[in-house]
């Protein structure tokens, strides 16, 4: 017996804000369905013959021309917010709470450049149960070994075959009748990287800023922290907070602490690639990550930070980018 949320039929919208709102509704309804099912599962509910599944929202665009809407200029003069040719393009979406501004901008540009409507609906791509948990949910840890093993029979777990980088690497070839990709990263790939960023940097992805520095020199990190703390002492600083591993938040002088600040605790030891975030209100601040030694770390962290779509990143240190 399959347990699924009420199906949300696809709708066609020419208003970017309305399209984003529909994405938010589908995602929130489906994630909350999974969270409630998980609470029931942890509480000992009978799932002997049950299979629980909820899927990501999708956005789809149909276009019949490579030309821009209302213009004779080709889209190859644009850097983003367009598709390269006629056809059907779609992608799955996740975390509209984190990506809302980004999605809204992309929806607006797609409609401005191609006209028509955006189709928003429920995809067939399952949301892995681990990707539905809220930031500080740790419900799985309360399960015994047998119940934890039974999870895979009830819920969808992360599937690495759905998280490859074929689109971003330019090697993805749609099968006959399949839509072209509308984004570099699918929803499961994004969710996977958001989870890994928590693990590698010791900070939540919500803290990351749009300008990123990487280094393998601790003295750069020390100076960055010193600079951040100095900025927090200035009531008129353009920066509003600095966040360190363990989600430890220091707010600018004159700003009140927020409830989420109480959840931060300095870890007993630093994570593999500790992250530090000097934040502006519009996310145009600076994130700095100590990638440590070795080219594998550099590739790993950039693979994951890429899903945040930062404006720029820069490596500091003569061997930091090998």
Regions found by a protein language model. Name each.
Residues 1-312, 320-322:
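Accessory terminal and edge-of-domain segments that mediate assembly/interaction
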């Amino acid at each position: 017996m399959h347990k699924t949320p009420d199906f949300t039929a696809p709708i066609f919208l020419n208003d970017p804000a309305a399209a984003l709102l529909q994405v938010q509704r589908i995602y929130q309804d489906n994630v909350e369905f999974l969270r409630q099912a998980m609470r029931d599962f942890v509480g000992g509910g009978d799932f002997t013959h049950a299979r629980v599944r909820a899927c990501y929202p999708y956005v789809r665009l149909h276009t019949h021309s490579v030309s821009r809407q209302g213009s004779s200029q080709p889209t190859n003069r644009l850097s983003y917010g367009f598709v390269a040719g006629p056809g059907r393009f779609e992608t799955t979406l996740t975390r509209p709470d984190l990506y809302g501004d980004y999605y809204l901008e992309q929806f607006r540009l797609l409609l401005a450049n191609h006209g028509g409507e955006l189709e928003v609906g429920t995809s067939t791509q399952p949301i892995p149960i681990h990707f539905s948990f809220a930031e500080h949910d740790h419900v799985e840890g309360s399960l015994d070994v047998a119940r934890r093993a039974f999870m895979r029979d009830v819920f969808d777990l992360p599937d690495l075959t759905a998280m490859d980088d074929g689109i971003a690497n330019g090697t993805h070839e749609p099968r006959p009748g399949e839509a072209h990709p509308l984004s570099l990263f699918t929803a499961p790939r994004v969710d996977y990287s958001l989870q890994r960023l928590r693990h590698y940097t010791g900070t939540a992805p919500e803290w990351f800023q749009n300008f990123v520095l990487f280094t393998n020199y601790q003295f750069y990190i020390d100076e960055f922290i010193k600079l951040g703390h100095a900025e927090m002492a200035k009531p008129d600083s353009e920066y509003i907070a600095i966040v360190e591993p363990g989600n430890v938040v220091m707010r600018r002088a004159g700003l009140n602490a927020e409830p989420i600040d109480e959840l931060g605790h300095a870890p007993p030891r630093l994570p593999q690639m500790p992250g530090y975030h000097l934040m502006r209100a519009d996310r145009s601040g600076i994130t700095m990550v100590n990638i440590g030694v070795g080219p594998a770390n550099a590739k790993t962290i950039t693979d994951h930070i890429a899903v945040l779509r930062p404006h720029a990143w820069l490596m500091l240190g003569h061997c930091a980018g090998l």
